[in-house]
Amino acid sequence: MAEFTTLARPYAKAAFIAARDASDLGGWSKALATAAAVSQVDRVKTVLSAPGLTAQQKADAFVALCGEELAEKQQNFIHVLADNRRLALLPEISVLFDLYKANQEKSLDVTVETAFEIDAATEKKLVEALSKKLDREVTLSTAVDKALLGGALIRAGDTVIDGSVRGRLAKLAEAMNV
């Protein structure tokens, strides 16, 4: 997985730069998400791995499957990926592109897991506090996990803040085993 991310990074960056320069981050994000979904269909994977087809034929077939979702520059991007045998990287390219897009827009998706349902007022306070701390516009999603026992587990990008009772007990158990 890390290898795929490393290979996908320059393509995601190139797509991001093209989208930013065209002021079309949303359109590119949608197109890449569609292409990533199409690339994960088993029959499509079979066609893309067929040794008898040229890169041009694979790209043309892939673009045809995506239909009207891809603009001309996005179709050209698919052809570049096919020429370099990188169509299988589309899911990683899409994820990385969305990370670049979120960074550009100064937004961040945050997931908060709690042992109990949190009310709207608490959710609003949490969004305000996280927005201020992270200097980003925060989009919050919540989940209930009774195994946490209490407290909260916050995931913001690659940052994890474990303020749960389960996390504290795990740290205590680890300290006692030392």
Curated annotation (Swiss-Prot):
<keyword id="KW-1003">Cell membrane</keyword>
<comment type="function">
    <text>F(1)F(0) ATP synthase produces ATP from ADP in the presence of a proton or sodium gradient. F-type ATPases consist of two structural domains, F(1) containing the extramembraneous catalytic core and F(0) containing the membrane proton channel, linked together by a central stalk and a peripheral stalk. During catalysis, ATP synthesis in the catalytic domain of F(1) is coupled via a rotary mechanism of the central stalk subunits to proton translocation.</text>
</comment>
<keyword id="KW-0997">Cell inner membrane</keyword>
<comment type="similarity">
    <text>Belongs to the ATPase delta chain family.</text>
</comment>
<dbReference type="GO" id="GO:0005886">
    <property type="term" value="C:plasma membrane"/>
</dbReference>
<keyword id="KW-0406">Ion transport</keyword>
<keyword id="KW-0813">Transport</keyword>
<dbReference type="InterPro" id="IPR026015">
    <property type="entry name" value="ATP_synth_OSCP/delta_N_sf"/>
</dbReference>
<dbReference type="InterPro" id="IPR000711">
    <property type="entry name" value="ATPase_OSCP/dsu"/>
</dbReference>
<dbReference type="GO" id="GO:0046933">
    <property type="term" value="F:proton-transporting ATP synthase activity, rotational mechanism"/>
</dbReference>
<comment type="function">
    <text>This protein is part of the stalk that links CF(0) to CF(1). It either transmits conformational changes from CF(0) to CF(1) or is implicated in proton conduction.</text>
</comment>
<keyword id="KW-0375">Hydrogen ion transport</keyword>
<dbReference type="GO" id="GO:0045259">
    <property type="term" value="C:proton-transporting ATP synthase complex"/>
</dbReference>
<comment type="subunit">
    <text>F-type ATPases have 2 components, F(1) - the catalytic core - and F(0) - the membrane proton channel. F(1) has five subunits: alpha(3), beta(3), gamma(1), delta(1), epsilon(1). F(0) has three main subunits: a(1), b(2) and c(10-14). The alpha and beta chains form an alternating ring which encloses part of the gamma chain. F(1) is attached to F(0) by a central stalk formed by the gamma and epsilon chains, while a peripheral stalk is formed by the delta and b chains.</text>
</comment>
<keyword id="KW-0066">ATP synthesis</keyword>
<protein>
    <recommendedName>
        <fullName>ATP synthase subunit delta</fullName>
    </recommendedName>
</protein>
<dbReference type="Pfam" id="PF00213">
    <property type="entry name" value="OSCP"/>
</dbReference>
<dbReference type="InterPro" id="IPR020781">
    <property type="entry name" value="ATPase_OSCP/d_CS"/>
</dbReference>
<keyword id="KW-0139">CF(1)</keyword>
<keyword id="KW-0472">Membrane</keyword>
